[in-house]
UniProtKB/Swiss-Prot annotation:
Its cofactor is [4Fe-4S] cluster. It comes from Rhizobium leguminosarum bv. viciae. The keyword Ligase does not apply. Keywords: 4Fe-4S, Iron, Iron-sulfur, Metal-binding. This is Hydrogenase maturation factor HypD. Pfam families: HypD.
Amino acid sequence: MKYIDEYRDGSLAKDVARQITALADPARSYHFMEFCGGHTHAISRYGLEDLLPANVRMIHGPGCPVCVLPIGRIDAAIALAMRPEITLCTYGDLMRVPGSNGSSLLKAKAAGADIRMVYSTLDALRIADAEPDREVVFFAIGFETTTPTTALALKAAIARGLGNFSIFCNHVLTPAPIQNILESPDVRKLGTIKIDGFIGPAHVSTVIGTEPYEFFAEEFRKPVVVAGFEPLDVIQAILMLVRQVNDGRHEVENQYIRAVTALGNEKAQAEVANFFELRESFEWRGLGEVPYGALRLRPQYAAYDAEKRFSMVTPAAKDNPACECGAILRGVKKPADCKLFGTVCTPDTPMGSCMVSPEGACAAHWAYGRFREKVRQVDARRAVA
C-alpha cells in the first residue's frame, strides 16, 4: 500500500539504525522524548528501541489526551451524566478511565446513566436532533487534531438550531506542555529527566504546522523533528535528532513532509479560533497546572458550554498513589517501573488512564513490550551466570 509498505521496510530500518550507531558519540548519552502516543506505539510495536545503541534512549511523553485528563474531569462528567435529563456522548476510550473510588463512565452507565459511545461529533449531533427532549452533551477531548471537528459540530448545531446540544470541552494543546516540561519548577519538583530533543507529533502538526515549535526550540535550545507514525518515519527522526545534537543545532525539522507543512491547515485553525479561546490554566495529569494548555468555548457560545449551562464543578481528586501514570507521562518512569503493571493493572482491570487509552504508554508496553522485557531479563541473568 502506497505510503505505508515502503515505510515498514525492515532492511531500511536496520540501515538507518546502523547510521545512528555510527553517528552516536559513545562518550555521551542521548535522551529523546517522543511526545505523541502514536509514536510510543510505533516504537513498541516494531521494537525500534532494540535497534538503537545503548546510549540512545527514548522517553515516553504526555501525548495522549485521555491519559493526561485529570480524575476530577472524569468525576465531573460522571456527576453530570447521572442527572436524569442528560445524555452524555463520549468516545469509547474514555468509558473505562478510572475516576475517584473506582468509578468510571462505564460503571455509571451500568448504574443507569444515559451514556452513549459515539464515533464522531456527528453521531452526537444526530442524537440531539432525534431526541429534542434530551440534553445531549458531547464529551469533547483531544489535541489540535480533533478540535476542528468539535468546532464544526458546534457550527452545525447553531445552524440547525439544536438548543439541546452542548459541549464539555477538554481539548488540550501540544506546545504548552512541552514548554511546561522544560521550564516549570512544579514539574521539576515532581521529577523529570534530561531531554536532548523531541520527536514532534504527526497528526497534530498537520493542523498546526511546524511553526509553533520554533519558539521553544530556540528558547530552550532543544531540537524538534516532526515525524510520521511508521517505523521508518520514527527511526529517521531519531537519526535527524542525533545529527542535530552532534552539530550543536536546535532547529525544527520536518521529517513528515508528505503530510505536514510549516503553516498547517489554516482553514481548520480559523474554525477553531472562531469558537474557542485559551484557558489561562488547565490541570494535566502528571504535570499539574499547565498555563494556556487547553481551550474553552468563547463567551458568546456560553449557551453551548456544558460547564456553564449545567454549573458543572470539577472536584479536587487524587490519583491512585500506587499508580505511576503521572511519572510515566512526565518521562520519569517507564511502564515496567510501576508495581501495578501486569498484576492488578491490565487492560481488563486498568488502574490508570495510561493502561486504558490505546495511545497510552502502558497499553503499548502491555501489547508489545512486556515480552521483550522478559527476554532482556533472561539474557541479563545468563550474562551474569
